[in-house]
C-alpha cells in the first residue's frame, strides 16, 4: 500500500492554477510575476467592460444608462433641451442676418454660413425631439434615428453650400466686408463656438452622438463666421486672392458632406438593429 504522503501529480492545465504536490510546485508550471498578474487582470476588466457595453447597446440602451443615475440623466436631459432652445434662438437670428448680407454683398461664405445656421436650427430641433420624451433619455433607437435625420440634412446643406460657392467663383464675386457683416461674423464666430463647447460636453456625458453632431455643426458655423473676416482681410491686402471666400465655402461644404455620409454609414445599420427595442417610445 502506497504511503499517504505520496500524491499523484498531473500535467498542469495552463488555464488553471495548479496546487502544489507534496509542498512543491509541479514541474513545468510557470508562476506569473505580480506585474504580469496585474496586466492580465487589467486586460480581463477591459474585455468585460467592452462586452458589457455591447450587451447594453444590444438591449436598445445607450451606455449612459450604466453611468448616470435616473435623476442625473433627467438633469442633463433638461440641460440639453435648454441649450437646444438657446441655440435655435441665436442661430435663427444669425441666419437671417447672414442671408441679408449674402444677398447684399454676394458673399459665398455669408451664404454658406447662413445655410449652416439654418442647418444648426434644424439639428437643434432634432435634438429637442430626441430628448422631448423623459423616458427615452437612454433610448438607442431614438438616438440613431435622430442621427440619420441629421445625416440627410447635412448632405442637402452641403450640396447647397458647394453649389453656391462654385457659382460665385465662376462669376468672380469679390469679397467685401462692411460694419454690418463684421458684426455678424464676430458674433457668429464667438456664440457658435461657445454653443459647440457646451454641446460637446453634454453629448459626452449623455453618450449622445446626436448632441455631438449638433455641436460639430455649431463649430462649423463658428469657423465660417471667422472665415468671412479672414477672406475679406486677405483680399484687402492682396486682390489676387479673390477666390479665398468661395474656396472656403467649398471646403466647408465638403467637410459637412463627408460627416453626413459617415454618419449615415454608421447609424443606418444601428437603426435596423435596435428597431425592436422601442420600449421607451
From Swiss-Prot:
Chief location of this protein?
membrane
What's in the GO CC field? early endosome membrane; synaptic vesicle membrane
Q: Where in the cell is it found?
A: Cytoplasmic vesicle, Secretory vesicle, Synaptic vesicle membrane; Early endosome membrane
Spell out which residues lie on the membrane's Extracellular side.
102-108, 167-179, 231-240
Extract the GO molecular function terms from the UniProt entry. Answer: zinc ion binding
Start and end residues of each stretch annotated as Disordered: 16-44
Spell out the disulfide connections: none
Q: Which organism is it from?
A: Xenopus laevis (African clawed frog)
Cytoplasmic topological intervals: 1-80, 130-145, 201-209, 262-281
Keywords on record: Cytoplasmic vesicle, Endosome, Membrane, Synapse, Transmembrane, Transmembrane helix, Zinc
Q: Which domain of life is it from?
A: Eukaryota
What is the purpose of this protein?
May bind zinc and other divalent cations and recruit them to vesicular organelles.
Q: How does it sit in the membrane?
A: Multi-pass membrane protein
Matches recorded under SUPFAM superfamilies: Cation efflux protein transmembrane domain-like
Q: Where are the transmembrane segments?
A: 81-101, 109-129, 146-166, 180-200, 210-230, 241-261
Q: What is the name listed in the Swiss-Prot or TrEMBL entry for this protein? A: Transmembrane protein 163
Record's family?
Belongs to the TMEM163 family.
Amino acid at each position: 500500500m502506497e504511503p499517504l504522503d505520496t500524491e499523484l501529480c498531473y500535467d498542469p492545465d495552463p488555464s488553471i492554477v495548479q496546487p502544489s504536490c507534496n509542498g512543491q510546485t509541479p514541474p513545468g508550471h510557470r508562476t506569473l510575476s505580480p506585474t504580469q498578474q496585474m496586466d492580465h487582470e487589467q486586460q480581463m476588466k477591459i474585455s468585460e467592460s467592452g462586452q458589457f457595453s455591447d450587451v447594453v447597446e444590444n438591449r436598445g440602451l445607450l451606455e449612459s444608462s450604466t453611468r448616470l443615475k435616473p435623476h442625473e440623466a433627467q438633469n442633463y436631459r433638461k440641460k440639453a433641451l435648454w441649450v437646444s432652445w438657446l441655440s435655435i434662438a441665436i442661430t435663427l437670428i444669425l441666419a437671417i442676418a447672414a442671408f441679408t448680407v449674402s444677398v447684399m454683398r454676394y458673399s459665398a461664405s455669408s451664404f454658406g454660413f447662413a445655410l449652416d445656421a439654418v442647418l444648426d436650427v434644424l439639428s437643434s430641433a432634432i435634438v429637442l425631439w430626441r430628448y422631448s420624451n423623459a423616458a427615452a433619455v437612454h433610448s438607442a433607437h431614438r438616438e440613431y434615428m435622430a442621427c440619420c435625420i441629421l445625416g440627410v440634412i447635412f448632405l442637402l446643406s452641403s450640396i447647397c453650400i458647394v453649389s453656391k460657392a462654385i457659382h460665385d467663383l465662376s462669376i468672380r464675386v469679390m469679397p467685401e466686408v462692411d460694419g454690418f457683416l463684421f458684426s455678424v461674423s464676430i458674433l457668429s464666430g464667438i456664440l457658435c463656438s461657445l454653443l459647440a463647447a457646451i454641446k460637446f460636453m453634454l453629448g459626452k456625458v449623455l453618450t449622445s452622438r446626436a448632441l455631438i453632431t449638433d455641436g460639430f455643426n455649431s463649430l462649423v458655423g463658428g469657423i465660417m463666421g471667422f472665415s468671412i473676416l479672414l477672406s475679406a482681410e486677405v483680399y484687402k491686402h492682396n486682390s489676387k486672392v479673390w477666390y479665398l471666400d468661395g474656396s472656403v465655402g467649398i471646403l466647408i461644404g465638403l467637410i459637412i458632406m463627408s460627416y453626413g455620409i459617415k454618419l449615415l454609414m454608421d447609424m443606418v445599420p444601428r437603426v435596423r438593429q435596435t428597431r425592436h427595442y422601442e420600449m421607451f417610445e
